[in-house]
Amino acid sequence: MRERIWAPPLLLLLPLLLPPPLWGGPPDSPRRELELEPGPLQPFDLLYASGAAAYYSGDYERAVRDLEAALRSHRRLREIRTRCARHCAARHPLPPPPPGEGPGAELPLFRSLLGRARCYRSCETQRLGGPASRHRVSEDVRSDFQRRVPYNYLQRAYIKLNQLEKAVEAAHTFFVANPEHMEMQQNIENYRATAGVEALQLVDREAKPHMESYNAGVKHYEADDFEMAIRHFEQALREYFVEDTECRTLCEGPQRFEEYEYLGYKAGLYEAIADHYMQVLVCQHECVRELATRPGRLSPIENFLPLHYDYLQFAYYRVGEYVKALECAKAYLLCHPDDEDVLDNVDYYESLLDDSIDPASIEAREDLTMFVKRHKLESELIKSAAEGLGFSYTEPNYWIRYGGRQDENRVPSGVNVEGAEVHGFSMGKKLSPKIDRDLREGGPLLYENITFVYNSEQLNGTQRVLLDNVLSEEQCRELHSVASGIMLVGDGYRGKTSPHTPNEKFEGATVLKALKSGYEGRVPLKSARLFYDISEKARRIVESYFMLNSTLYFSYTHMVCRTALSGQQDRRNDLSHPIHADNCLLDPEANECWKEPPAYTFRDYSALLYMNDDFEGGEFIFTEMDAKTVTASIKPKCGRMISFSSGGENPHGVKAVTKGKRCAVALWFTLDPLYRELERIQADEVIAILDQEQQGKHELNINPKDEL
């Protein structure tokens, strides 16, 4: 039965889903031959193993030579596979489905597939200088290259060879994909301090061109340089589609059939084709997520591909190219057809067109039209196959927009506000707005019983606020109970018990860990949820008080307790947490704060919500940029919250805790959705599941006390 069900759809849809690329550079001509490169390609896993062995034996010159060769071999292997696949797809295109079924109707399709397979094997063998099987590597090696582990070896080897600039490049390249690697962060700081801050530029040797161009486009857009923004966004799109082709090609390699023992796998022809092809197709479908995910992150940039067209539609409008603005706006609507702002923009752009142009003749950009058409076909086929072949698949929302559009009423500088209002034009595209923070303070506190204590002026600084009664005494006790049940020594500090001072012990826990512990019954679920709820409460207060026009996102949330170690408190002159800024590298001697990696440059606001006062010391302090002159000192107590902007205008630290345990919820926020906290997203999903379960219990009239 399965053969009769699935053979026709596969025959019909394969030509639609597997054509030669229609974008990302000129397509390969069927008669075009690949240029050959001299010399057989050495397997990158062997070079990697040789380089690592040389490093451990102290032969650093050989380590550098072999590790660099391994990286080159890895890149060249990907290029060869991509080029061979495109070359063979062009030489052996899949035929259209025959007009009527009859004997041998499927033979033209299989002839093309066999020809493509023969071409691909020949191409790979010729360009690799030997059989492709020599280049199959283990999952461990594949994972090491994905995590950029060879660059960790390289930075150490280059230091041994006194090649500081190359060491910094390698260290930074590794750190980009491993942003929580505290040792590497310290290495980069040390290298740059040795050479001088200005002497060395941080280079990511594995940077993706489409990401680099996109980031450059955003910067020019925010600077109102729309001509340059257009240039970079268009370049980003060209590079994106090239990367998409490579990603999809690499999905066509060997697949693992985890549900079957190899010797017991005796599928029929069409079942075998379907099993393999579905794995390939799901992998290709996920390239949207792959290309939107920055190195070292699990969560993709939200709405990444559509955002290019969102930026472009407004940028083209600003330079007076209304037809292109309309094309990009309509392209964006392919992904978000109900976006009211962009629908309004389409109406406005159409009103600006020359009378000789029919608005109906202006269609969405062809590149995204083709992309979305294929994406929808893939989605339909995967869902249908999942139902018919009995495998599990959940379609992700690839174009999700978190929290909706929050800055829809903002009008970028230089645009006539009255004119925009008359035409109903919605201009709200700057996702990381430049805020005049001196003028944005004093908004509503949103909740009853919260007591305003001091503002920026009273705290002798900029963008600061002190509030009381954000938590009740009962909530403080409940959070303390949660902390006692879930905190681990060194959590949040790479397992280091005393990351800032040897005289105190640090313990921590995240929101997600609290919710998981509550779900598993290790702490009361209600108490675990309180941690989640009060952090959201703090976020809303900060967003409102500082009068932000765009959504404030969580960047990191951490419950932390620091305990004074007995016998180590005599004549202490150190700090519990040294003076620092939250989004830049503080340089007290130069009175500067360098907003560059490895600092968390994306953080915009910070907050500390205190849980107790039964300890000695531990005052929170603000200082001047010299890290010595104290401008304000705050004694923690239950329910007190200090919040401030995260930049060099607010250097701060914590005085030594000399007795007892000091506990607080530390929160960092960002205005850039690209840097949202992954664990917070996962915590949101846990809360949604819990809410659904609770709703189901109410519908079934189950007593809440029966909850496990």
UniProtKB/Swiss-Prot annotation:
TPR repeats lie at residues 44-77, 148-181, 210-243, 306-339. It comes from the Eukaryota. One of its GO terms (biological process) is negative regulation of cell population proliferation. This is Prolyl 3-hydroxylase 2. Its cofactor is Fe cation; L-ascorbate. It comes from Homo sapiens (Human). One of its GO terms (cellular component) is endoplasmic reticulum. Fe cation binds at H580, D582, H652. Its EC number is 1.14.11.7. Residues 1-24 form the signal peptide. Residues 557-671 form the Fe2OG dioxygenase domain. It is found in: Endoplasmic reticulum; Sarcoplasmic reticulum; Golgi apparatus. Its main location: endoplasmic reticulum. GO terms for molecular function: iron ion binding; L-ascorbic acid binding; procollagen-proline 3-dioxygenase activity. Glycans are attached at N449, N549. Belongs to the leprecan family. Keywords: Dioxygenase, Disease variant, Endoplasmic reticulum, Glycoprotein, Golgi apparatus, Iron, Metal-binding, Oxidoreductase, Repeat, Sarcoplasmic reticulum, Signal, TPR repeat, Vitamin C. It is linked to Myopia, high, with cataract and vitreoretinal degeneration: A disorder characterized by severe myopia with variable expressivity of cataract and vitreoretinal degeneration. Some patients manifest lens subluxation, lens instability and retinal detachment. A motif (Prevents secretion from ER) lies at residues 705-708. Expression localized to the epithelia of bile ducts and to the sacroplasm of heart muscle and skeletal muscle. In the pancreas, localized to a subpopulation of Langerhans islet cells and in the salivary gland, expressed in acinar cells (at protein level). Expressed in adult heart, placenta, lung, liver, skeletal muscle and kidney. Detected in fetal heart, spleen, lung, liver skeletal muscle and kidney. PROSITE patterns: ER_TARGET, FE2OG_OXY. Prolyl 3-hydroxylase that catalyzes the post-translational formation of 3-hydroxyproline on collagens. Contributes to proline 3-hydroxylation of collagen COL4A1 and COL1A1 in tendons, the eye sclera and in the eye lens capsule. Has high activity with the type IV collagen COL4A1, and lower activity with COL1A1. Catalyzes hydroxylation of the first Pro in Gly-Pro-Hyp sequences where Hyp is 4-hydroxyproline. Has no activity on substrates that lack 4-hydroxyproline in the third position. The active site is at R662. Inhibited by pyridine 2,4-dicarboxylate, an analog of 2-oxoglutarate.
